[in-house]
Structure formats: C-alpha cells, structure tokens
Amino acid sequence: CGNPIQLSLFQGIPVDDLAFAGENAHKARGIQEQKRDAGVFSAVDVGLNVKDGCELYVPPSIRHEIGADALAMMYKSGFLEQKENCLVTDYGTNAEMALKIGDEIYTGSAAAGPAMEGQSIKCGMLAGPGAISDLEYDFKWVCKVLDDDIIPKDGDKVDFGLEIIEENGPMHGKAKGITGTGVIAAVAAAMDDHLWKKGKLKTSDGKLHLQDGVYIDSHDIAEALKAIGAMRAGHFTLLEHAGIKFSELDIMYMAGASGTYVDAVKARQVGLLPPSCNTIYQYGNTSLAMATDILKDPELLDELQDIANGIRANHIMFAGDKIFEQIYMQELAVCDEGMSMEMYNKNNAMVGIQELPKPKGTPTVHRMVQRDIPDLGERGMYILHDIGTELRGYMDGCIGCKKCEQECPEHALTVADGNEIVVKTKNCLGTACYRCQFSCPKKVYKYDNLKLTF
C-alpha cells in the first residue's frame, strides 16, 4: 500500500507519466498514461519468492501522484466522511496532503525532505532505542528518550537558557541521537525560550545541548524549518486554490509515524499544521492499517476502487505552481535570513495571497492510537537486533581515516582491518542520509559498491 512510484516499480509499470502533470504535457512527449487500478496478481509473477498460488493484493491509486497511500490516509482517518472543511497530511518525507471542501478534494505533495524523519540532522536518527523523541516542559525541558520497547521515558532535565543539565533522569546515559519528532520539539523549545533569532541559535556555541552529547545547531533548525516551510506552503497553497480562508478551516488529521508521535500542540506552534486548526486527530500508519484490512477482507479492494473512482480530486503540482513558489520563497527567507512574519505576510499580500494568522488558544487533540502500528497481533512486537546480513566491501584509495564511521548517525558502519567497510543492514540500507559517502575526504566511498553477505 505505497505511493504510485513504489507500486509501479514493484509491478513493472512504466513511471514516465508520473513525471509530468496534465494531458498536454503527456501528449507533447508521447507519454501514455498508465492505469493503476486495484487488482489481484500472482505474487510469483512479480518476482516474490513465495509458493505458487500466493496472491498479491494491490489497492488503487486515485490519479497521478495521489496513490494508494494517500487513499489509505483519507479512508482510515475518517477524512472522507467529515462534513466540515478539513485537511489531512501524512507527515513523512513526501508529505502527501489533501484538503476537503464539501465534495471537492484538493491534493498535493510537498516533498518536505528527510529532516522529518531525523535525517540531514547532525545527531539525527530514525526512531529506535536511545532516540530523543520529544521535550516535555516541567519548569525545565525534560528529554524523552525511547527505551528498548520504543516507549518514551524521562531523560535529563535541561535548562537551555543557563545551558546546564539541571537533573539526571532515569534514561541518563542512554541517548544516542534525536528523531524527527524530537527535532520539532527542540525547534519549539528554542522558540519558547527566545533562543532562535534571525536564523541563528543565540547560545554560547550556537548549539542546543540536550543530553549525552546529543545536540542540534542552527543548521539543523534551519533544515527542519525548510521541511516545515514546505508543508506550510503546501497547506497554504491548497487553501488558496480552494478559495477559502484559514478561519474556515478547523479540523486537521495527522497520519504517518511522525504524525502519530509528534506533540500536536508543538507541531502547530512551529507551523506543521495550519494555525487555525483547533481540532486535531492523530492517526497511525494508515497505509499499513489499510493493507491489513485488505488481507482480512480482499473484497475491500472493490470498495476502495469505487471510492477512488468517486473522488473528485484537484491535484496541484507544487513544483510548477506559482502560489506555492511565492509562499515557499517567504518560508526560505524566514528560516535562512530570519525574515519577520510581518514581512512574510506583507510580501504575500502584494500578490493577493491571504495573511497567515497566529495560532490562538490550545487545540483539542484526539490521539486515536498510541502507536503508529496500533494492532501488534497476538504475539506482540519483538525487535530483531541481528538480521544476519551485512554489506561489505573495499574502496580503492581508502586511507582508513574512519570519517565515514564517525559520521554515521545510525552507528551502522565500521571500518575493519584492511580498511574493509562493514555496514549492518538492520541499521542502514543506504537509502537515507548518505553521510558516509559525502564525508569521504578522498571521494572514493561508494555505497553501491558494497556487497551483501550472510
């Protein structure tokens, strides 16, 4: 239950029609639009190593970039049944979003980047044991650190203004990095403590020290604000295309892992959801939830196809949209140059774009699930710490400086005897940050040259 590109590559369907929007663009390039309807296929025929007769269920896309994952987001959250104006967003790297105004649905994808998942952040990591996932205010800021069961527990209590650890917590000494939700909390804390001014952290060393050597700096906050800015510009653009004001939008649905675990109040404060939204619903991994529903009841595919056919969607390609371009330029000026929100609104008003209001009051937050995967089944969850595979290889020209090892945020990489590169595949599959490759001073490290070993 993935996005159109994922499912198309998986099924062997050409993806060139996804690169361009509109019939004219396709016609000019001789591109044929592909059908991505629901279907039941042979799992063996698509290359899966399973027994003959095993069936593969593929849910439908709606159109263009609006894939099965976006349909799941709308279907499982209750978004489609909502009578009031409402917005739903999957808070991940691609930030799929949809705005419902009556029977009309406006969709887009903001390509927020990896900061939402803890990547491109110096101490960033994916959610796992030892990750700082939140900061909770209790007169000082308490770091929330994920334990071995991925449950947030109290870490150290920090005074960012005085730049001291006020008190050690039960998770002292166990923090290894910070997740995307932790970064959002840190950005909110920096703003609350008036430490983020004109695009810089106003601390003695330009860093916000959390615990156990984990920190975020001005560059990290700027990266996070770019991701936040992309999402805010996306939401803003959908409202402008729909012709409604922020004051007419109150209901927000948050999906995805980050949408489940992030503090929704802090998220609204920093701009991850519209400031007018005072009724917030947090859901889990809606794609996995819908996939589970299909496995339990394969006939659901027919219902989902009917829903997909009936959605009147207006898809906005943000990459070529003038409204998005105008708003995102202001977002970049805010995070890179410290431009004031007054100037932000003034610049947008000059081209007829409505004002971005300030958040008012405390929103009502409905946490619909406690985990992004709410149903763990009869056997519960078990974290497999060794999956038995590694990536290994030698790089011609490697000088053994171990810079790649030092830069790996997941502690997945080691430089062994003879400068052999060893990567634990349980921690890294080479699809996220590429810090190892970028950090190589001789530019000889190539992740793709590593070979899988058992």
Could you say what each language-model-derived stretch is?
Residues 41-69, 293-397, 407:
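Acidic, glycine/GT-rich loop-and beta-edge segments that sit at the periphery of enzyme/chaperone cores
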Residues 1-87, 103-104, 215-228, 332, ...:
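Nucleotide/phosphate-binding catalytic cleft detector across ATP-hydrolyzing
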Residues 3-14, 244, 256-277, 316-331, ...:
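Short glycine/threonine-rich loop-to-helix capping motif typified by GTGT followed
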Residues 7, 13-36, 60, 72, ...:
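Glycine-rich phosphate-binding loop of actin/hexokinase-like ATP-binding domains
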Residues 178-227:
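Gly/charged contiguous loops adjacent to phosphate- or pyrophosphate-bearing nucleotide/cofactor binding elements
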Residues 1-2, 91-93, 203-209, 248-258, ...:
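A glycine-rich phosphate-binding loop feature that marks nucleotide/adenosyl-phosphate handling sites
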Residues 70-73, 224-247:
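Phosphate/ATP-binding catalytic cores across multiple sugar-kinase/actin-like superfamilies
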Residues 403-419, 433-452:
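Iron-sulfur cluster-binding cysteine motifs and their immediate structural context
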